[in-house]
């Protein structure tokens, strides 16, 4: 019973925006964000440092930079509206923050889709301690 309670708390703790971002990734790549993009390279997932390992990791670096510019927003928790039709994601109405967060997520999902051919399994679950190059600036 305790395990079920812990799982429920963890599910509630998953930010709405991250679930939306996962759906966008699925639309553009046909892959789930979890696990394919949650700990890929040096920038996909929480935090980031060093130099992006490849084009997919660069998508995550740019996404992190996009979020960084949203100083008065909560990009990991604000819920936004969007729709899609034949592989095109369209950000909907909402607050300025919601629209900007949606655009950051949309751009990253599109970037992932454009770089599917160069995705390397060796960078899945890449250990942070191997990200030793100087960190790039946004």
Swiss-Prot record:
Where in the cell does this protein reside?
Secreted
Q: List the disulfide bonds.
A: 42-131, 44-60, 59-111, 65-138, 66-104, 73-97, 91-102
Q: Which cofactor does it need?
A: Ca(2+)
Q: What class of enzyme is it?
A: hydrolase
Keyword Oxidoreductase listed? The answer is no
Question: What family is it from?
Answer: Belongs to the phospholipase A2 family. Group II subfamily. D49 sub-subfamily.
Q: What is this protein called?
A: Basic phospholipase A2 PLA-N
């Amino acid at each position: 019973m305790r395990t079920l309670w812990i799982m429920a708390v963890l599910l509630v703790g998953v930010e709405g925006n991250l679930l939306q971002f996962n759906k966008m990734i699925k639309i553009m790549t046909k892959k789930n964000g979890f696990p394919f993009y949650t700990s890929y390279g040096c920038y996909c997932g929480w935090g980031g440092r060093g130099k992006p390992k490849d084009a997919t990791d660069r998508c995550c670096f740019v996404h992190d930079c996009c979020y960084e510019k949203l100083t008065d927003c909560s990009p990991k928790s604000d819920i936004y509206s969007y729709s899609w039709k034949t592989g095109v994601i369209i950000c909907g109405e909402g607050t300025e923050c919601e629209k900007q967060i949606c655009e950051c997520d949309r751009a990253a999902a599109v970037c992932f889709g454009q770089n599917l051919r160069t995705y390397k399994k060796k960078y899945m679950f890449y250990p942070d301690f191997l990200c030793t190059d100087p960190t790039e600036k946004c």
